[in-house]
Amino acid sequence: MVTATHPHSLGKLSRIRHLARQYAALTKPRVTQLAVFCAIIGMFLATPGMVPWRVLIGGAAGIWLLAGAAFAINCLVEQKIDALMRRTAWRPSATGEITTPQTLVFSAILGGAGMWLLHVYANDLTMWLTFATFLGYAVVYTILLKPATPQNIVIGGLSGAMPPALGWAAVAGEVPAEAWFLVLIIFTWTPPHFWALALYRRADYAKSGLPMLPVTHGERYTLLHILLYTLIMIAATLLPFVYGMSGYIYLAAALALGAGFLAYAWKMYRNYSDELAQRAFRFSILYLSLLFAALLVDHYFKFVPQV
C-alpha cells in the first residue's frame, strides 16, 4: 500500500533542507574541510601509533565546529562587503536570508559545542588554543586587520595556519617544534594562495573597498610578492626533513609539489592572465592537501637510506 505524502509536508521539508544548506554555507565548508584535514594530519603525526578514536572523532568535530563558528562571524561582519562582490553576493548573510541575530546564535551554538567536545574528548590546551584561533580569525583578522592593511593576510594568517598544532595538541597535550613547522608551512602558503585569488578577483575587491594587495599596490607588485613568498614557503616545507621529523618520501613530495607551485608563480610573473591566476589558486589547494598527505604517508612508511 502506497501512502501519499501531503504537499504541505514536502514543502516544509524542502524549506528545512534549504535553510540547513544556508546555515552550512555560513561555515564556508570547503575551507573548513581543508583546515580540519590539516588538523587530523597533525593528530597522526603526534603519535607513532594510531590516534585514539575518541580524540580523532571528538577532537576533529570540535575543531570543525569552532572553525565554522569563526567563519559565521566572518560572514556576519562582512555581509555588506559580500553583497558588493559577485563571488560572495549569494551568501545568506549578504542576501539577508539569515539575519544578524540568527547568525550570532548559530555561531554561539557551534562555538559552545566545539569547546565542549574539545574539553571532553581532547584536552583543555586544545580547547583554549582553538578558542584563541577563533578569536584570531573572527576578531583580529576579520574586524581589525582585513579592512585596515593590505598585509592583512600575512599578519592575520597565523589563525588560519593553526589547525595542525591544534590536532597535535589534542593527541599529545603539547605543541612541540614539529607542530610549529606545520603551522609555518601553512602560514607561508597562505599569502601566495590568497593573493592569486585576489588578483583574478581584484575588480570585486576594488568594489568592496577592502585594501587587498592587488588593489592597493597593483598587479606587478603582487606577483613579485607571490613569487617571493612561494620561495619562502618552499624553504619552510624542507624543515620537517632537515629536523629529522620526516624522511625521503616527504622530501620528494615537497620538492616536486614546490616545483609545481613555483612554476605557477613564475609563469604569472612573466605573463600574467586571470585564467592562470585561477589555475594557480586551485593548484595551491591541491598542493597543500597533497603535501600534508605526504607527511602522513612518510610518518608511517618513512624511508631513510642507511649510510
From Swiss-Prot:
GO terms for cellular component: plasma membrane. This is Protoheme IX farnesyltransferase. Its EC number is 2.5.1.141. Gene3D superfamilies: UbiA prenyltransferase. It is an enzyme of class 2 (transferase). Converts heme B (protoheme IX) to heme O by substitution of the vinyl group on carbon 2 of heme B porphyrin ring with a hydroxyethyl farnesyl side group. Belongs to the UbiA prenyltransferase family. Protoheme IX farnesyltransferase subfamily. It catalyses: heme b + (2E,6E)-farnesyl diphosphate + H2O = Fe(II)-heme o + diphosphate. It is found in: Cell inner membrane.
